[in-house]
Amino acid sequence: MASTQMQSPADVLAALGPGVGLCGELAPFAGGSAGLPLAQRLAEHPLLMAPMAGVTDSAYRMMARAGGADLAYSEMVSCAGLHYGGEKTWELVDVAPGEPDLAVQLFGTKPELFAEAAADVAERLGERLVLIDINMACPVPKVTKKGEGAALMETPELAASLVAACAGTVDVPVTVKIRRGRRDGAEVAPEFARRMADAGAQAVAVHGRYATQFYHGEADWDVVRRVVEAVDVPVIGSGDVRDAREAARMLAETGTTAVMVARGSYGNPWIFSQARALLSGHEPEPVSLVRRVDAFECHMCLLAATGAHLKRGRSLATWYLRGMPEAAYWRGRANECSTLEEFLGVTAELRRAMAEADASKDAAHE
């Protein structure tokens, strides 16, 4: 069982990461070469951990980076929330000890608040801020009804003004994340992406669904390809990148400079290193069930070390334990936990149960 006394996130990764096939020390994006153009850095380091609200906290980002992600994004951060000084909002952009750097995603509708937020985030993070991304893709009604997120795709002039406001304020690159369009059947992504690039966006991430689809149906990678053909800035492909092979296929089939992995990383931080192996012409090693349990334990220790709410571990259990024997039982056990010690007790029991099951199989074959 992992120690519950480790306090530093960097110490947790150094102690537990290598044992589960993860890096014990995290490197900065593109080796920290901030002086190089973003296009070059993305081309050489194309595997990105997507921003996900309620998911990509510091512990999750560190697991993804340890699993091979070249760069990880914050959860989407409200410009208004930063303006009004909510400490909970500011916590979303904080970088934990051992986390080398961060891409911060902002959302809102007011250019002046975007300029202020970008400047404040840049001051707070300093050299650890890689880029500012503007969310123009979130399909959630409580966001779009305010004209934010994917609703901005119906107000391109306003969207362009947000890009210009940020680009005119900070020295780091400003990028955008968009969808195929807001409403089913109304594809605007290629032209919209051109307008954002003209306004100063140095890269465009494209999710191949309409906002009205949410995450239903299939992402259309053809629209990603059309955006690649429409703009002169790097395009980052997103949508239905569920495993390492799909990450490699996105790059090969669409011509994108980089690929953004979201739900495919659930319980699978190795997706990035596996994709890198495929891109290098090598077959990735499979991940054993025991290694997944150990990685869940590592992730829980990172949650504790970064001061995150440990109830997030209940979702993590669903993801890491998916497909295991009696997974529903073990998920139920995890759902009863609220402290690190309780979670680690469950993983210890699970590990013993797996060892006993293996021993029984071996005895049956003797």
Roles of regions detected by a PLM:
Residues 1-43, 47-48, 53, 59, ...:
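Alpha/beta catalytic cores of nucleotide-metabolism and tRNA/nucleoside-modifying enzymes
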Residues 20-41, 52-127:
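Glycine-rich, positively charged N-terminal anion/phosphate-binding segment
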Residues 36-48, 83-101, 138-148, 167-175, ...:
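N-terminal small/glycine-rich loop or linker at the start of catalytic domains
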Residues 45-55, 102-114, 152, 177-189:
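Active-site mouth loops of central-metabolism enzymes
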Residues 52-54, 77-79, 107-109, 137-139, ...:
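Active-site beta-loop-alpha junctions enriched in small/polar residues
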Residues 115-148, 155-233:
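Alpha/beta enzyme core
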